[in-house]
Structures are given as structure tokens and as C-alpha cells.
Amino acid sequence: MPRSLKKGPYIAQELLNKVLVAQETRSKKVIKTWSRRSTIFPDMVGLTLAVHNGKKFVPVFVTENMVGHKLGEFSPTRTFYGHAGDKKAKMR
């Protein structure tokens, strides 16, 4: 369920501060964040954010197509190794 329009999109205040500082200084330094729930704003386009997936930080380069999505969508938390195979089929 999407967030109410009267509330507006959510962004962590410390992440917003880091993004604004990076824009002012034209810094290309990677910004680390644990805030997977923050919405991507147009101000973030062109920056690289390191989003935590629970184990490590995944670098995410923000493009125009990502605006409006959440940061957590681009940092997968689960690893899929494939379904278990049929042991009888392998023996043949």
C-alpha cells in the first residue's frame, strides 16, 4: 500500500543532509546509508549511494528512472541459490 499523498514521500533527515552537502561540493564520494525505506528524490540523480542489505553495503548509482522508488528495492537482501534438484534424475 503506497504512502498517503497528504503526508508526502519519506526520506531520512541525515540522508537528505548528506545528499545536499554532496551536491553543494560536487562530490562523487559514495554515501553510506542504512535507510532502505527512504524514497529516491530528483536531487539524488547522479550520486552513488551504498545501501545496506543486512550484511554489506551495495553500491547503487541513482538514475532518473529510479526517482520515486525506495532505496531498498535496489539492494537485494536474499540470495537465491536455485531449487534443489531431483537426486534420482541425476543418477541416470
UniProtKB/Swiss-Prot annotation:
The keyword Transmembrane helix does not apply. InterPro entries: Ribosomal_uS19, Ribosomal_uS19_bac-type, Ribosomal_uS19_CS, Ribosomal_uS19_SF. Protein S19 forms a complex with S13 that binds strongly to the 16S ribosomal RNA. Keywords: Ribonucleoprotein, Ribosomal protein, RNA-binding, rRNA-binding. GO terms for cellular component: cytoplasm; small ribosomal subunit. GO terms for biological process: ribosomal small subunit assembly; translation. This is Small ribosomal subunit protein uS19. GO terms for molecular function: rRNA binding; structural constituent of ribosome. Pfam families: Ribosomal_S19. SUPFAM superfamilies: Ribosomal protein S19 (SSF54570). The lineage of its organism: Bacteria, Pseudomonadati, Thermodesulfobacteriota, Desulfobacteria, Desulfobacterales. NCBIfam families: rpsS_bact (TIGR01050). Belongs to the universal ribosomal protein uS19 family. HAMAP family: Ribosomal_uS19 (MF_00531).
